[in-house]
Amino acid sequence: LAFFDVVGKPIAVRSSSLLEDSHYQPFAGIYSTYMISSLDDKNEMLRLLLDAIKAVYASVFYADSKAYMTATSNVIDQEKMAIILQEVVGTQYNDRYYPSFAGVGRSINYYPINDEKAEDGVVDLAIGLGKYIVDGGRSLRFSPRHPNKVLQTSTLDLALRDTQTRFYALDMNRGEKPFSIDDGFNLLKLSVRDAEKDNSLRLMVSTYDPVDQMIRDGYYDGGRKVVTFANILQHKAFPLASILDSMLTIGSREMGRPVEIEFAGNLVGSGNTPGTVYWLQIRPIVDMKEMLSDEVMDLPDERTILKSNTALGHGVMDNVSHIVYVKSSSFKSSNNVNIAREIEKINRTFTEREENYILVGPGRWGSSDSSLGIPVKWPHISS
């Protein structure tokens, strides 16, 4: 109870395990993470905390976790876990709580564009809680060493179509709601318009002018607000890009290999402090030479099934014997959940045979938004 009094804010309950932080085959996002609202009734808050700790431990045995362990040749007996309690970064706006921004950064980028280099790193950035990025939402992707070059905002059509429109916040009203194994049971998925009402978007958005058919950097009355982070990335109202570059550089140097970090920040500063970035987590990335090599095998056309001059990334897999293809004509948001179930059945068959396959289809794989892609999870595609 004294811990609650000292923190005075919502608490994140998350795992820290041997397999998650392994230098040889790390994985993240497999186990559950819960957020507990700050309540006046500390005994009720303690009950929620105890339930959350039990649920995080129990998530080791969920189907998603077991499927991932099987796919990576790990066994539950090898796993050891501690629980971390972290203050949730954010600001309370009436009955909801969320940070100005959250994101994931990687010190190595397998998909550089133009004059970017793999070692320049890459960041996925979004308004609100980081769950939006983990769930495959439309985050803003950029290299911290090239903050002026953001592909998603390079044209008007891309900016209106491929930028963030939703975000997650913690519901501060649901302390008495029955606890659930769904770690998002007390989270709200809101529209960016809701954040506009909170007056929390000033530095993160630009304004679309439908009359002149252009996007103006900055927040102006009227017009659709487009999440571009232009004031921060291009106009340097807050030195986020350089901060993230330093974090990735230091993390890679100290861990002796590429790293992935999670971070969040508040731009509601006090006094002369414009804002604060919080380093939430760091883990190693396993890098393979094949994934960075620019050399592509020159195969004759008669031995080539699919070829592209605009593909991103590199990789070599020599143990694939099947192709599963989802036809573009079948891609409909109303049908994508059913397609995910069918893929799960196919995946189960290949898992039992101990055979691997390539999965090809339209849209964004693994997105929680079925209008963007087929919402598969690890148990669906573990082979």
Description of each model-found segment:
Residues 1-383:
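Conserved mixed alpha/beta core segments that line enzyme active sites in large multi-domain catalysts
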